[in-house]
């Protein structure tokens, strides 16, 4: 049996650009317009120094790939060593090191806790997109 199939390869050093963001921005063709998520969201970066209230019990949020955002635990300010991010209802948050397994959450009325570790990226939606819709798209 003769194999007439040939496999073309490109050496890595010969590639012009191996940039996933560039690929998606320039190579995906759709009859619908595509826009950056950043155009419709606001990154929340302001941090609160919970350790400045050492005797107050602060309620901390967590995120899992099964549950999304959840009330994790409460901790006294004196036991917290870093500034945390305040998360209001409608905000989304994810851990950039675990987003690939679906570790993203949406804060709703179901979560009573209000702060999350600065290890998470927190953002809210502008009026141009519903946070529930964006959450479902990102979770899929």
Ranges and model annotations:
Residues 1-48:
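Non-catalytic DNA-recognition/assembly elements of restriction-modification systems
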Residues 30, 80, 109:
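Flexible, glycine- and charge-enriched loops at secondary-structure boundaries
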Residues 1-10, 14-19, 56-57, 103-109, ...:
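Glycine-anchored helix-breaking recognition loops at helix->coil/strand junctions
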Residues 30-34, 84, 128:
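Short, solvent-exposed loop/helix junctions and linker helices
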Residues 35-50, 55-89:
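Sequence-specific dsDNA recognition surfaces
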Residues 85, 89, 93-139:
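A short beta-sheet element
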Residues 26, 76-79, 123:
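Generic anion/oxyanion-binding catalytic loop in active/binding sites
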């Amino acid at each position: 049996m003769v194999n007439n199939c040939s496999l073309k390869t490109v050496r890595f050093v010969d590639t012009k650009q191996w940039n996933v963001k560039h690929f998606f921005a320039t190579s995906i063709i759709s009859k619908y317009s595509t826009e950056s998520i950043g155009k419709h969201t606001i990154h929340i970066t302001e941090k609160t120094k919970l350790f400045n209230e050492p005797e107050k019990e602060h309620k901390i949020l967590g995120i899992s790939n099964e549950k999304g955002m959840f009330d994790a635990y409460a901790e006294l300010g004196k036991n917290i060593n870093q500034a945390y991010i305040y998360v209001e209802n409608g905000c989304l948050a994810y851990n950039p090191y675990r987003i690939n397994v679906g570790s993203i959450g949406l804060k709703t009325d179901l979560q009573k806790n209000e702060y999350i570790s600065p290890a998470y990226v927190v953002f809210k939606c502008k009026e141009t997109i519903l946070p529930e819709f964006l959450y479902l798209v990102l979770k899929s």
